[in-house]
């Protein structure tokens, strides 16, 4: 039996199509589910089973006007969405800092880099420099990929050099780690983190 | 010259009262500054100098109604403050996960435990279990203390046992690590993290 380092047994993943999955439908748009919902379920699974503590950060909001009615809760009457200067998810696995962003595309040929903005790339570079484990989870072409931040940086810099504004399907399949979707956890990205950063044959530190 | 592990030189702290500090005033309420502002400045200092990447999480808000006017930004028309289930600050230092909450009290005799709620304590326990570095920064009695989460747990559990709903001044001075306030960084909590978790004489892992 495969066990996580904390001694918890690893629950084997089930193929798409069992239980709540509708057979034959694999893209998020078709399934009526979202990448975010699947990641929240995954993080909840990690938390409950003591595998990792990873949370999605709240949506950043600029609050302009708040009403404080008597005998009831404060009501925010005017606020605006702010662009985040960091990534959406972070937390801890085996003491190490984990930081990632999740994105999906409906394009069938490539993943557009406009899904990220300069501030986020800058943040990811700072995290890598500080020894954190940083990556992006990309849902594209009917699959979900784990792309290490260092690879994203390569494509980001190339955009500046030759103007190519996307990662082609072939490139993503080559640089990314394909994740098999399961029932619970749905997107077992910690398995990839474990392989890349903690196993004996780890390519990374 | 003292250097951080990344080779950056340590900027010696300056006593309270120099530059923008008004001599003789040491509590946040008197100075017209907030603990949060000082921590934001400190985190900015760490970021710019490549010492650590720590951010305050956005305030969690439950969005109920959003207006999408033509040709201008979406306006949130109704939203409510939500209780956070985690702590306010997290990030990475030398690869390790850092997680903390900051609180201040105007009480002159003790620090009330009602500043925390069960969900936050639960989160801090999960972080500790996962090998993260977790603590609280408490501004009280004219000083700022770094209290390891494990000590906070002790006082939290005692509350359940004998009903004492606060940490006395003496107890905080005994269990907490007094931080000298500086000009930049203002509250050098990473110095305490370094001593407790990374130096040869580290009491912790």
Swiss-Prot record, chains A, B:
E.C. number: 3.1.21.10
* Keywords, comma-separated and alphabetical: Cytoplasm, DNA damage, DNA recombination, DNA repair, Endonuclease, Hydrolase, Magnesium, Metal-binding, Nuclease
Enzyme superclass (EC): hydrolase
Q: Which InterPro entries match?
A: Resolv_RecU, Restrct_endonuc-II-like, tRNA_endonuc-like_dom_sf
Q: What reactions does this protein catalyze?
A: Endonucleolytic cleavage at a junction such as a reciprocal single-stranded crossover between two homologous DNA duplexes (Holliday junction)
Q: Where is this site: Transition state stabilizer?
A: 103
Task: Name its co-factor(s).
Answer: Mg(2+)
Among its keywords, does the record have Membrane? no
Residues reported in the UniProt entry to bind Mg(2+): 86, 88, 101, 120
| Cofactor binding annotation | Binds 1 Mg(2+) ion per subunit.
Q: Which CDD domains match?
A: RecU-like (cd22354)
Cellular localisation: Cytoplasm
Drop me one GO molecular function for this one: nucleic acid binding
Q: GO biological process annotations for this chain's record? A: chromosome segregation; DNA recombination; DNA repair
Where does the record place the region Disordered? 1-26
Q: Name one GO cellular component term.
A: cytoplasm
> Which HAMAP family would you find in this protein's record?
RecU (MF_00130)
Q: What role does it play?
A: Endonuclease that resolves Holliday junction intermediates in genetic recombination. Cleaves mobile four-strand junctions by introducing symmetrical nicks in paired strands. Promotes annealing of linear ssDNA with homologous dsDNA. Required for DNA repair, homologous recombination and chromosome segregation.
In which family does this protein belong, per the annotation? Belongs to the RecU family.
Quote the protein name from its UniProt record. Holliday junction resolvase RecU
């Amino acid at each position: 039996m495969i066990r996580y380092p904390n001694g918890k047994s690893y629950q084997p993943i089930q193929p798409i199509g069992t239980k709540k999955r509708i057979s034959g439908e694999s893209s998020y748009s078709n399934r009526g589910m979202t990448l975010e919902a699947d990641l929240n379920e995954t993080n909840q699974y990690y938390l409950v089973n003591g595998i990792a503590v990873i949370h999605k950060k709240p949506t950043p909001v600029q609050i302009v006007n708040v009403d404080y009615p008597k005998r009831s809760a404060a009501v925010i009457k005017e606020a605006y969405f702010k662009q985040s200067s960091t990534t959406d998810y972070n937390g801890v696995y085996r003491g190490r800092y984990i930081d990632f962003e999740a994105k999906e595309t409906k394009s069938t040929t490539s993943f557009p880099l406009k899904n990220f903005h300069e501030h986020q790339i800058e943040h990811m570079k700072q995290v890598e420099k500080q020894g954190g484990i940083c990556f992006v989870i990309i849902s594209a072409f009917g699959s979900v990929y784990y792309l290490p931040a260092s690879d994203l940086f390569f494509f980001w810099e190339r955009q500046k050099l030759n103007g190519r504004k996307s990662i082609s399907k072939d490139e993503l399949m080559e640089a990314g780690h394909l994740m098999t979707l399961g029932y619970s956890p749905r997107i077992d990205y910690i398995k990839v983190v474990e392989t890349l950063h903690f196993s004996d044959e780890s390519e990374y530190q």
